[in-house]
């Protein structure tokens, strides 16, 4: 009697007979490696078996990362085991981020914020402080400094026409005759502004008397309060003294304010 040939079926047929569908995914760990076996349909609608091998390694992670891995999963992944699920999670390369504060970099490169540099410079002693806070203010050093500046400004005013620089018509010596027709000479008059409200005529005289002789001074006051309105006019006897006053007092600190001194503009009849 001839032997009956045994026909061996494939594992896919056996799985179909036993389960009638896709079997569940299985995981086994052997020799420090994890084997994940899963089943799925390919493009031809045939069942296929996929085996993935993972190497198990231990690494030290921050506490926050370890705590996050213990969070309870939810939704369709609530029954998944700890760790990423290959069917729903794709692990990409690890990216390290470094946060930079652009404002701190700008402050570090700002030369004005350099503690080794001082932007203040005294006009009296050339120290690293403002002139209004100078300990030598009002002393002999202050007087000598103002006299030197007055001499330098007077020499510059005398040599100004020879330097080729533009001189306004009302400042030229040739206009003195025409100015005399108006009854007042503004060529030696200056306007001092940014004065404090407590300024008095005595303070104004004390401010300019060391520069040169004056012919007239006018301190603008408010009619109601009698306080200074913030500006004054000083007429010097010589134009070189007026130029020296502008050079010395313009930008000079006085009574916690920075003075602004310029030539007085002529009045039109």
From Swiss-Prot:
Keywords carried by this UniProt record: Cytoplasm, Initiation factor, Protein biosynthesis, RNA-binding
Gene Ontology cellular-component annotations: eukaryotic 43S preinitiation complex; eukaryotic 48S preinitiation complex; eukaryotic translation initiation factor 3 complex
Membrane-spanning residues: none
Record-level Gene Ontology MF annotations: RNA binding; translation initiation factor activity
Matching InterPro entries: eIF3_g, eIF3g_N, eIF3G_RRM, Nucleotide-bd_a/b_plait_sf, RBD_domain_sf, RRM_dom
Main location: cytoplasm
Cell location: Cytoplasm
PROSITE patterns tied to this protein: RRM (PS50102)
Family annotation (Pfam families): eIF3g, RRM_1
Gene Ontology terms describing biological process: formation of cytoplasmic translation initiation complex
CDD domains (UniProt xref): eIF3G, RRM_eIF3G_like
Domain RRM positions: 188-266
Function, in words: RNA-binding component of the eukaryotic translation initiation factor 3 (eIF-3) complex, which is involved in protein synthesis of a specialized repertoire of mRNAs and, together with other initiation factors, stimulates binding of mRNA and methionyl-tRNAi to the 40S ribosome. The eIF-3 complex specifically targets and initiates translation of a subset of mRNAs involved in cell proliferation. This subunit can bind 18S rRNA.
Record's subunit section: Component of the eukaryotic translation initiation factor 3 (eIF-3) complex. The eIF-3 complex interacts with pix.
Family of the protein in this entry: Belongs to the eIF-3 subunit G family.
Record-linked HAMAP family: eIF3g (MF_03006)
Protein name per its UniProtKB record: Eukaryotic translation initiation factor 3 subunit G-1
Organism phylogeny: Eukaryota, Metazoa, Ecdysozoa, Arthropoda, Hexapoda
């Amino acid at each position: 009697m001839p032997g009956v040939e045994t026909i061996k079926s494939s594992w896919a047929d056996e799985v179909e007979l036993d389960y009638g569908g896709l079997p569940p995914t299985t995981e086994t760990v052997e020799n420090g490696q994890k084997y994940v076996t899963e089943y799925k349909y390919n493009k031809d609608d045939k069942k296929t078996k996929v085996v993935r091998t993972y190497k198990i390694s231990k690494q030290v992670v921050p506490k926050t990362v370890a705590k996050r891995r213990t969070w309870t999963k939810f939704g369709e992944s609530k029954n998944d085991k700890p760790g990423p699920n290959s069917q729903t999670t794709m692990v990409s390369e690890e990216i390290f981020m470094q946060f930079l504060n652009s404002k701190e970099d700008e402050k570090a490169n700002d030369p004005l914020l350099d503690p080794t540099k001082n932007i203040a410079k005294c006009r009296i002693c050339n120290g690293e402080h403002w002139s209004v806070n100078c300990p030598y203010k009002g002393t002999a050093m202050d007087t000598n400094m103002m006299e030197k500046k007055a001499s330098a400004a007077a020499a510059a005013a005398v040599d100004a026409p020879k330097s080729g620089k533009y001189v306004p018509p009302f400042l030229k010596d040739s206009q003195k005759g025409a100015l005399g027709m108006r009854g007042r000479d503004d060529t030696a008059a200056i306007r001092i502004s940014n004065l404090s409200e407590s300024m008095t005529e005595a303070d104004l005289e004390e401010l300019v008397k060391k520069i040169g002789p004056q012919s007239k001074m006018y301190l603008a006051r408010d009619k109601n309060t009698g306080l200074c309105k913030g500006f004054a006019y000083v007429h010097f006897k010589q134009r070189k003294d007026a130029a020296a006053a502008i050079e010395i007092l313009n930008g000079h600190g006085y009574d916690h304010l920075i003075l602004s001194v310029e030539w007085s503009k002529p009045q039109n009849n």
